[in-house]
C-alpha cells in the first residue's frame, strides 16, 4: 500500500469529455497539419464543445474488445469496478476516429487517391473490431468549395468516396485550408460532438441490455457496476441530469451489498467514488444544499463501517480523504461563483479531515508499534503481477476472492503486517498540517478569527510533534496575542507550556526566559509545584546553568537539547535580555504614579513605582530604572541593591528590591525639574526591572509608559465593574487595584506673588485713544528683576479685530494702521518687596463689538529648592473684556427753506442741510469742532462756520447744525449728486488735554437734483398787522432756453383783501425775471392763509401748484391792530 492510495484517481476527479482521435495528421513535419491540430487544441474557449482530442497514427492498436456474454447465469463477478475502466473510456477507446486525408475534388489521380483513402479507413475499422466507435473522414483541400449543388463533380465524387469507404454522407467532411480555418474547425467539432453523443447513447443502451440477465442473488456487484457505467457514459455524453440520477441509484445499490470485513474496503471505496461524483454534479448544477445533504448522508452511512480493528487507521484515512475531497469540491464551486458563509464554508470540512488524520495518527501509533526485530513479510503481500489492482478497494493478496471466509489466515496476517509497517513510515504530521493550513486559509477568508486561532494552535502542536520546533514556536507565538487579549487563560497556559518545550528543545535563551516569566505569572493556571519547577529552571538559566528538561518531551530531542544547553553554558558572558512586557503577562506587575498631574517648578517632582509579584516564592531583583522623555532625569530615578545570584530565590524579605508574592511594594522617587521644562510634559517612557546580575545573565523587564501588561486593561475594566468589597489590609499595605497609573505630569511655572490691577472707564468709544492703567505691586519677599509687561488684544480672536485694534504707550498721538494689536515684553524695571509701578496703555478700536484684552506680567526671581538655587520665571496675567460702542449717532436731513422735507433738490434753488449729533456714549463728550466739506457739485449760500464748537454732550443729548446750500446744476437722476463730508472732532470730556481729539468723518448722502423750468420766490415782511397794507413782490425767473408762456392767477383768501392783477398771461424770455407786485390788506389776526398764487406753464404741464408752494410762503402771522396807551391806563396798569 502506498501512502497515496487514498487519493482519488485522476480519471474520477476530472470532467469527463467525449474522446475523439484524429489520424492522418503529421503534426511534426507538415505545417498545414500542424495548423489544423493547433486550431483543434490550442486556446480552447469555454463556449466550445467538450471534446478531448488526441492525434494517433492510422494503424494505432486500440484496446481489444472482449467477447460479449450471451448469459450471466453462471457468471460470478470478481469485483465492482476495474481500475482501468474509467481511464480506458476517457483516454483509450474513442467515441469517434477521424481520418484526415489531403484530397481535392479536381485531383487528376482521383482513383488512386480514392483507393488509398478507403484503405486507411479499413485499417482503422480493423483496429476497432467489435467496438461501436464511429469513423469519419475529413478531406483537407486547398480550394474553398462551391455552395452545395453548384459543383456537380464534387457531388459525384463525394458519393463515390462514401460508397468505397462504406460511410454515410454525414461522416464525410471537407476542410479547406484558408484564412478562416478556425471557423471551419469549430463547425467540424460540432459535427464530431454529434457523432460522439450517438456513440455514448449506444453504449448506454448496450449496458442497460445486460441488466436484463442479472439477478440480485449472485450479481449484486454487477448492478452497481452497470449503474456506475451508465452514469459515467451519461457524463461523457454531457447529460449531467441523467448522470446524477444514475449515480444516486448506484450509491443506494452499493449500500445494499452485504458488508463483511473482507469486502468493507471495496464497498467504502466505491461509495466514496460515487459520492464524489454526486457532490460534484450537485455543485455543477448550483444546488449546494443537495451536495451538503448527500455528503452528510454518506458520512452517516459509512462512519461506522470501520472494518478490521487491526487496520482502524485505514478507516480514519478514508474518512479524512472524504472530507478533504468535499472541501476541495466546495472551494472549487466558490471559485466558480458560489457564495459561502461563515457557518458553512470549506474550512469546516478541511478541519474535520485534519481531525480524522489526527485519529489516523493515533491509531497508527497504537497499532503499528512493532519491535524493530519484526521484519517486513517476504514475498511482499502488497505486490501484484501487474503492479496495480484489478478492482478498486480490494486487497492485493486476495484479488477477486469474494468469499467471506479467509482461505489463508497466514497470508492475511502477513498482509495486515505489511500494511501496518507501511503505515509506520507515513509522515502523518505533514498530512495533518496541510489540512489544517487549508482550513486556516478558509477561516481567514470568511473572517472567523477564533476558528483560525484554534486551528493554528493545532498546527503549532503538530509541528511540535513533527519536531519542527521553529515553525511550531512561530505559530504558537502568533496566536498567543489573541488568547491574551480575550483572557483565555487556560488555553494560553496550554500554548505557553508547548512553547516552553519548543524553546527548551532548541535552547532558545530569550524565548525560554520569556515563556517562563509568563507561566509564573497570574495568567498561568499551572499548579504551584509546576510553577516552582519553572522558577527554579529560570534561576538556573540566570546563573548560567542548564535547566532541567521539560516533562513529556521526546527522549532523543531532550538529549540533543542538553548538548545545546551545555554549549550555551560554555559560552558564558555578559548576556542581558531586554524583554518588553506590554505584549505578555509576566509574573511581576508594575504601576508608576506621579503624586499630582502638575508640579510647580519650585517644588520637587515626586512619584511612586508600585511592584507586585505573582510567583510562588519571594524573589529579589537587583535594579530598578525609570526612564523619562527628558533623559536628564533618568540619573535621579535608579534604585540598585547589591545581591549575589544565589540569593535571588532565598526567603529574604528585607530590602526594597525583594518582592513577596501577593504584597504590593512601593518605591518612592523625587527630583527637581529644570526651569527650561516649564510648560512641558514630563512622561515616564519606561520602567526597567533587572532580575539577575548584569555581569552574568540578566533579564530586564521593561514596561512602556507607567506600567501595565497585556492583561492590565481588561483587569482594570473588571475591577471598575466589580461590586465586590475590597478586603481590609494593614495600614502599611496597599490594595493593588486602588493604584491608578499616572505616567505623565506637567511642569508649570512658580506661583507668582504679585498683584496686577487694571483701571479704565468702559465702554471704549470707537476710534478714541482708550486709556488702560496697569498697576503692578510686588508681594515677594525678595527683589524681582527683569519685569516685563505684555498688553493688548488677546491672541486667538477674530482676525478682523486684530486688524482694527492698535495699542501704544504714547497717548499724545493717534494710532494708525502701523501700530500692533499686542505690545510684547515691555521692560518696566525691577521691583523691591512692597513696591508698585503704573504703566498706561492706550488702545484704539476701529470697530464696535466685544474685545478681550490681555495684560501679562513676567519677572525673574531667585529661589531655593531642595538646597539648590534656581532662577524661576514667574508670570501673572489678567484679561478684561471691553465693549466698544459708537460715540454718537449723526442724522442728516435735506429740507426746503420752509423747513419742509425734500426728497430731491432743484438746480440753483437754495435748500437747507440739517445735521443732528446724538450722544450714544455713557460718558460726557466734548465736540471740539465740526466742519462741512462740500463736494464740487455743491456751493454754500453763506460762510460754513461750526455752530457746535466746544459743546459738551451728556448721554442722550444732541447738537444740531443747519447749512444753506445750493446745487448749481442737475446731476444724474438715478445716482444723485454727492453732497460731501461732515467731520466732527471730539473726545471724552474727562480726558487730559494731551490726548488728541478724534476726527469722525461722516459721508453725507447723495441727493437727487432736478432742473425746474420756472423759479418763483416772494419778498414779503416777516409779519403783518391787521388793517395795515402788506406789500408782496413775486419774482418769476425763466430757467430754460425757451420763451415761457405763463398764466398767473390769484385766489382770494377770507383773511385778506388784496390789490393787483388777479389774472394775467405773459411771456418771460429765457434767463430773464418778471416781477408781480400785490398789496395785501389783512383782516384777521393770527396765522392766516395768504391769497394763493397759481401759475400754469403752457410748455410744461408737469409744473404744478403743489411744486410752486415749495418755494413761496403760503401763510403769515398777522398781529392785531395796535392802539396808543393813555397815561391813566399806564398808571392803572
From Swiss-Prot:
Locate the N6-acetyllysine modifications and list their residues: 245
GO-annotated cellular components: cytoplasm; TRAPPIII protein complex
Q: Name one Pfam family in it.
A: Gryzun-like
List locations, semicolon-separated.
Golgi apparatus; Golgi apparatus, cis-Golgi network
Q: Which GO terms describe its biological process?
A: constitutive secretory pathway; COPII vesicle coating; endoplasmic reticulum to Golgi vesicle-mediated transport; Golgi organization; regulation of protein complex stability; vesicle tethering
Known InterPro entries for this protein? TPC11, TRAPPC11_C
Superkingdom of origin organism? Eukaryota
Q: Which UniProt keywords apply?
A: Acetylation, ER-Golgi transport, Golgi apparatus, Transport
- Signal peptide residues on this chain, from the entry's feature table: none
What is said about its interaction partners and assembly? Component of the multisubunit TRAPP (transport protein particle) complex, which includes at least TRAPPC2, TRAPPC2L, TRAPPC3, TRAPPC3L, TRAPPC4, TRAPPC5, TRAPPC8, TRAPPC9, TRAPPC10, TRAPPC11 and TRAPPC12.
Family recorded in the similarity comment: Belongs to the TRAPPC11 family.
> Could you tell me what this protein does?
Involved in endoplasmic reticulum to Golgi apparatus trafficking at a very early stage.
Protein name, as recorded:
Trafficking protein particle complex subunit 11
Q: Which organism is it from?
A: Mus musculus
Name of the gene this protein is made from = Trappc11
Amino acid at each position: 500500500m502506498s501512502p497515496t492510495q487514498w487519493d482519488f484517481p485522476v480519471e474520477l476527479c476530472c470532467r469527463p469529455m467525449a474522446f475523439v482521435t484524429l489520424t492522418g495528421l503529421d503534426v511534426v513535419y507538415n505545417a498545414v497539419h500542424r495548423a489544423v491540430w493547433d486550431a483543434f487544441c490550442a486556446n480552447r474557449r469555454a463556449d466550445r464543445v467538450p471534446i478531448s482530442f488526441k492525434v494517433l497514427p492510422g494503424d494505432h492498436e486500440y484496446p481489444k474488445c472482449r467477447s460479449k456474454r450471451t448469459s450471466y447465469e453462471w457468471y460470478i463477478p470478481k469485483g465492482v469496478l476495474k481500475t482501468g475502466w474509467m481511464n480506458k473510456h476517457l483516454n483509450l477507446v474513442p467515441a469517434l476516429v477521424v481520418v484526415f486525408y489531403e484530397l481535392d475534388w479536381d485531383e487528376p489521380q482521383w482513383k488512386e487517391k480514392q483507393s488509398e483513402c478507403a484503405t486507411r479507413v479499413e485499417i482503422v475499422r480493423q483496429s476497432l473490431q467489435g467496438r461501436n466507435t464511429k469513423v469519419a473522414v475529413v478531406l483537407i483541400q486547398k480550394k474553398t468549395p462551391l455552395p452545395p449543388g453548384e459543383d456537380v463533380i464534387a457531388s459525384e465524387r463525394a458519393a463515390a468516396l462514401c460508397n468505397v469507404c462504406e460511410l454515410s454522407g454525414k461522416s464525410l467532411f471537407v476542410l479547406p485550408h484558408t484564412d478562416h480555418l478556425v471557423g471551419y474547425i469549430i463547425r467540424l467539432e460540432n459535427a464530431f460532438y454529434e457523432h460522439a453523443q450517438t456513440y455514448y447513447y449506444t453504449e448506454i443502451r448496450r449496458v442497460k441490455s445486460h441488466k436484463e440477465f442479472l439477478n440480485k442473488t449472485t450479481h449484486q456487484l454487477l448492478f452497481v457496476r452497470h449503474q456506475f457505467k451508465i452514469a459515467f457514459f451519461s457524463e461523457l455524453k454531457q447529460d449531467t441530469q441523467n448522470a446524477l440520477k444514475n449515480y444516486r441509484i448506484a450509491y443506494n445499490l452499493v449500500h445494499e451489498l452485504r458488508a463483511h470485513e473482507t469486502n468493507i474496503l471495496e464497498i467504502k471505496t466505491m461509495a466514496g467514488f460515487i459520492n464524489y461524483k454526486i457532490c460534484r454534479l450537485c455543485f455543477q448544477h448550483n444546488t449546494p444544499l443537495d451536495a451538503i445533504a448527500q455528503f452528510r448522508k454518506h458520512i452517516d452511512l459509512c462512519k461506522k463501517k470501520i472494518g478490521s480493528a487491526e487496520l482502524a487507521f485505514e478507516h480514519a484515512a478514508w474518512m479524512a480523504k472524504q472530507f478533504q475531497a468535499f472541501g476541495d469540491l466546495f472551494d472549487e464551486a466558490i471559485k466558480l461563483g458560489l457564495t459561502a458563509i461563515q457557518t458553512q464554508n470549506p474550512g469546516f470540512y478541511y478541519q474535520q479531515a485534519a481531525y480524522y488524520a489526527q485519529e489516523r495518527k493515533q491509531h497508527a501509533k497504537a497499532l503499528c508499534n512493532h519491535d524493530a526485530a519484526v521484519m517486513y513479510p517476504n514475498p511482499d503481500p502488497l505486490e501484484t503481477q501487474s503492479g496495480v489492482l484489478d478492482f478498486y478497494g480490494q486487497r492485493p493478496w486476495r484479488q477477486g476472492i469474494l468469499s467471506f471466509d479467509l482461505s489463508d489466515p497466514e497470508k492475511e496476517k502477513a498482509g495486515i503486517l505489511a500494511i501496518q509497517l507501511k503505515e509506520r513510515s507515513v509522515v502523518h504530521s505533514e498530512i495533518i498540517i496541510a489540512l489544517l493550513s487549508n482550513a486556516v486559509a478558509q477561516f481567514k477568508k470568511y473572517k472567523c478569527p477564533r476558528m483560525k486561532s484554534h486551528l493554528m494552535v493545532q498546527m503549532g502542536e503538530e509541528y511540535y510533534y513533527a519536531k519542527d520546533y521553529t515553525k511550531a514556536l512561530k505559530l504558537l507565538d502568533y496566536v498567543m496575542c489573541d488568547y491574551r487579549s480575550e483572557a483565555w487563560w487556560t488555553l494560553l497556559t496550554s500554548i505557553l507550556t508547548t512553547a516552553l518545550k519548543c524553546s527548551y528543545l532548541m535552547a532558545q535563551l530569550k524565548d525560554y526566559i520569556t515563556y517562563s516569566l509568563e507561566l509564573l505569572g497570574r495568567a498561568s493556571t499551572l499548579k504551584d509545584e509546576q510553577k516552582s519547577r519553572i522558577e527554579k529552571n529560570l534561576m538556573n538559566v540566570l546563573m548560567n546553568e542548564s535547566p532541567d528538561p521539560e516533562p513529556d518531551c521526546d527522549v532523543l530531542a531532550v538529549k540533543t537539547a542538553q548538548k545545546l544547553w551545555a554549549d550555551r553554558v560554555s559560552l558564558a558572558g555578559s548576556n542581558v535580555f531586554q524583554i518588553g512586557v506590554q505584549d505578555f503577562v509576566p509574573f511581576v506587575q508594575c504601576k508608576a504614579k506621579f503624586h499630582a498631574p502638575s508640579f510647580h517648578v519650585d517644588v520637587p517632582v515626586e512619584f511612586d513605582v508600585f511592584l507586585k509579584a505573582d510567583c510562588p516564592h519571594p524573589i529579589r531583583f537587583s535594579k530598578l530604572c525609570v526612564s523619562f522623555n527628558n533623559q536628564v532625569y533618568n540619573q535621579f530615578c535608579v534604585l540598585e541593591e547589591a545581591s549575589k545570584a544565589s540569593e535571588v530565590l532565598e526567603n529574604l524579605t528585607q530590602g526594597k528590591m525583594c518582592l513577596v508574592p501577593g504584597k504590593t511594594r512601593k518605591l518612592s522617587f523625587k527630583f527637581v525639574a529644570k526651569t527650561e521644562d516649564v510648560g512641558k510634559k514630563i512622561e515616564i517612557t519606561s520602567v526597567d526591572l533587572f532580575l539577575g546580575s548584569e555581569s552574568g545573565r540578566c533579564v530586564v523587564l521593561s514596561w512602556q509608559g507607567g506600567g501595565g501588561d497585556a492583561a492590565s486593561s481588561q483587569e482594570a475594566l473588571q475591577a471598575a465593574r466589580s461590586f465586590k468589597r475590597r478586603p481590609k489590609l494593614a495600614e502599611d499595605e496597599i490594595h493593588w487595584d486602588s493604584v491608578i497609573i499616572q505616567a505623565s505630569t506637567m511642569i508649570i511655572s512658580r506661583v507668582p506673588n504679585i498683584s496686577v490691577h487694571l483701571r479704565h472707564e468702559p465702554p471704549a468709544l470707537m476710534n478714541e485713544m482708550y486709556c488702560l492703567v496697569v498697576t503692578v505691586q510686588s508681594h515677594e519677599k525678595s527683589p524681582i528683576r527683569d519685569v516685563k509687561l505684555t498688553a493688548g488684544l488677546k491672541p486667538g480672536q477674530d482676525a478682523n479685530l486684530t486688524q482694527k485694534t492698535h495699542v501704544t504707550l504714547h497717548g499724545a498721538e493717534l494710532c494708525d494702521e502701523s501700530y500692533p494689536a499686542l505690545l510684547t515684553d515691555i521692560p518696566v524695571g525691577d521691583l523691591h518687596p512692597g513696591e508698585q509701578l503704573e504703566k498706561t496703555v492706550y488702545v484704539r478700536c476701529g470697530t464696535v463689538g466685544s474685545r478681550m484684552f490681555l495684560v501679562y506680567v513676567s519677572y525673574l526671581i531667585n529661589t531655593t529648592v531642595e538646597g539648590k538655587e534656581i532662577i524661576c520665571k514667574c508670570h501673572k496675567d489678567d484679561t478684561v473684556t471691553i465693549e466698544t460702542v459708537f460715540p454718537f449717532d449723526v442724522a442728516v436731513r435735506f429740507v426746503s427753506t420752509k423747513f419742509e422735507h425734500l426728497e430731491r433738490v432743484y438746480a440753483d434753488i437754495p435748500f437747507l442741510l440739517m445735521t443732528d449729533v446724538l450722544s450714544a456714549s455713557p460718558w460726557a463728550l466734548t465736540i471740539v469742532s465740526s466742519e462741512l466739506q462740500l463736494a464740487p457739485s455743491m456751493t454754500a449760500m453763506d460762510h460754513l462756520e461750526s455752530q457746535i464748537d466746544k459743546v459738551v454732550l451728556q448721554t442722550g443729548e444732541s447738537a444740531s447744525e443747519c447749512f444753506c446750500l445750493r446745487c448749481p446744476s442737475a446731476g444724474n437722476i438715478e445716482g444723485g449728486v454727492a453732497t460731501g463730508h461732515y467731520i466732527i472732532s471730539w473726545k471724552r470730556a474727562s480726558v487730559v488735554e494731551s490726548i488728541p481729539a478724534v476726527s469722525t468723518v461722516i459721508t453725507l448722502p447723495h441727493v437727487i437734483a432736478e432742473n425746474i423750468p420756472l423759479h418763483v420766490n416772494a419778498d414779503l415782511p416777516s409779519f403783518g398787522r391787521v388793517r395795515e397794507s402788506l406789500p408782496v413782490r413775486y419774482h418769476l425767473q425763466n430757467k430754460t432756453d425757451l420763451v415761457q408762456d405763463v398764466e398767473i392767477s390769484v385766489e382770494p383768501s377770507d383773511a385778506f383783501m388784496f390789490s393787483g392783477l388777479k389774472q394775467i398771461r405773459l411771456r418771460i424770455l429765457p434767463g430773464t425775471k418778471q416781477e408781480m407786485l400785490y398789496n395785501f390788506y389783512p383782516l384777521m389776526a393770527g396765522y392766516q392763509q395768504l391769497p394763493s398764487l397759481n401759475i400754469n406753464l403752457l410748455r410744461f404741464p408737469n409744473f404744478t401748484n403743489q411744486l410752486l408752494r415749495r418755494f413761496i410762503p403760503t401763510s403769515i402771522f398777522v398781529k392785531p391792530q395796535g392802539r396808543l396807551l393813555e397815561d391813566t391806563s399806564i398808571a392803572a396798569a
